[in-house]
Amino acid sequence: MNKSHHPHRGLLLMVVAPSGVGKTSLTRRLVSDHGDLHLSISATTRDPRPGEHDGRDYHFVSRDKFQGMLAEDAFLEWAEVYGNFYGSPKAPIMDALSRGESVLFDIDFQGAMKVHKQAGADSVLVYILPPSLAEMSRRLHTRSQDSEEVIHRRLSRAKDEVAAWEQFDYVILNDDFDRAYADLAHIYHAERLKRARNPWIGDLVSDLLKEEI
């Protein structure tokens, strides 16, 4: 029996990390390497950063548009971060799950906790640790996107998140990108193989037990 022809139960894979730890590079590569994994593209009211594109990195919307989406209950979760709003549009996520496909969230801590509270066993929480706060600070200064005040807030928030590491199913140290990516890919593969996400196995077992020896 070819298991590729049998339905899976999709999962919500949430990857959380402080800014400057490499989360975006890890998640984009995972989606690129796995055709059955879809990236949840968040809507945000913040301005695009250099190199970001609407519809690929984020859906960049006005505050009025975001408020309208809130009124329509269009988000699975939403949050205000550093004065800007972020939200995960519900419709594409539900569509992917209905096809038995999985959805990857490149998401912040509070957003991940909200989704996990709603999705329960259908969600998997992964936290990416920096090798040190000093290295994280160096990366944030190197990319020259934030003021000193914002960088300080990001570092303080990172310490608060790291203190909550036990709330996550998996924790990955990103001191080597290729190794961290391999760990993330292994987590995704293992979660997809779980019995609860492969309902077709029950029918296969029933057929096997009916066979004469």
Swiss-Prot record:
Start and end residues of each Guanylate kinase-like domain: 10-189
One Pfam family of this chain: Guanylate_kin
EC top class, as a word: transferase
Subcellular location, record wording: Cytoplasm
Record carries keyword Cell inner membrane: no
Functional summary from the UniProt entry: Essential for recycling GMP and indirectly, cGMP.
Protein name: Guanylate kinase
Organism: Caulobacter vibrioides (strain ATCC 19089 / CIP 103742 / CB 15) (Caulobacter crescentus)
